[in-house]
């Protein structure tokens, strides 16, 4: 299944939670979810008891859409997490958090992961001094992530940094905003990653 490219705010209304897909609009309280906090449709979707499988699928979809990964990428990451020693769900979240596009977003250089992905694919990002244009590139502890020189005054990046002042920066990155670079200091602990996803249901889904 390809990466979702449809109306992103409909996804948030479908799931009833913010997936950080519309950064500035969400912060301003102007997102579709803020205005219409019910599922898309004339009267919204009817509420009913969701099955166990439905719940598992829902959590997987939320994680996929939030991090902007395809089904193939998601399955590959889950398989890697399952092979490692430790809590599979926590390891999965850590692997998702280590994606370069996500790290650029977490450092506050983009208001959404989607824009962060564009920055990466268009060649605006350096990793340890080398240009990397692969959004799924895995960032390891100690890596330096930097905006290329000619893009440091990009108005969208500047605006993202300004908005970050309202939300703050996560604890596992150190950022020099004025110099437009940051250090991915470590993998996050699960309790530090505030996302509306219960990964245990994803583990149950793929463990069948």
Swiss-Prot record:
NCBIfam families: PRK05327.1 (NF003717), rpsD_bact (TIGR01017). One of the primary rRNA binding proteins, it binds directly to 16S rRNA where it nucleates assembly of the body of the 30S subunit. Part of the 30S ribosomal subunit. Contacts protein S5. The interaction surface between S4 and S5 is involved in control of translational fidelity. This is Small ribosomal subunit protein uS4. The gene is rpsD. Transmembrane segments: none annotated. The keyword Metal-binding does not apply. It comes from the Bacteria. SUPFAM superfamilies: Alpha-L RNA-binding motif (SSF55174). The lineage of its organism: Bacteria, Pseudomonadati, Campylobacterota, Epsilonproteobacteria, Campylobacterales. GO terms for biological process: ribosomal small subunit biogenesis; translation. It comes from Campylobacter jejuni (strain RM1221). Belongs to the universal ribosomal protein uS4 family. Keywords: Ribonucleoprotein, Ribosomal protein, RNA-binding, rRNA-binding.
């Amino acid at each position: 299944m390809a990466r979702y490219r449809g109306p992103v705010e409909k996804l948030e209304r479908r799931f009833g939670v913010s997936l950080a897909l519309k950064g500035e609009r969400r912060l301003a309280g102007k997102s579709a979810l803020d205005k219409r906090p019910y599922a898309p449709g004339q009267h919204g979707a009817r509420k009913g008891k969701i099955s166990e499988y439905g719940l598992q699928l829902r959590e997987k979809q939320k994680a996929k859409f939030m991090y902007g990964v395809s089904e193939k990428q998601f399955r590959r990451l889950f398989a890697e997490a399952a092979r490692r020693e430790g809590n599979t769900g926590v390891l999965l979240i850590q692997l998702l958090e280590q994606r370069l596009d996500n790290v650029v977003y977490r450092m506050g250089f983009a208001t959404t992961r989607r824009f962060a992905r564009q920055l990466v694919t268009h060649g605006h990002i350096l990793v340890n001094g080398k240009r990397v244009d692969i959004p799924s590139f895995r960032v390891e502890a100690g890596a330096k992530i930097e905006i290329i020189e000619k893009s440091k005054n990009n108005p969208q990046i500047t605006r993202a940094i300004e908005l970050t002042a309202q939300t703050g920066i996560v604890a596992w990155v150190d950022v020099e905003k004025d110099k437009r670079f940051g250090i991915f200091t470590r993998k996050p602990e699960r309790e530090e990653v505030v996302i509306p996803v219960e990964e245990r249901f994803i583990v149950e889904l793929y463990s069948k």
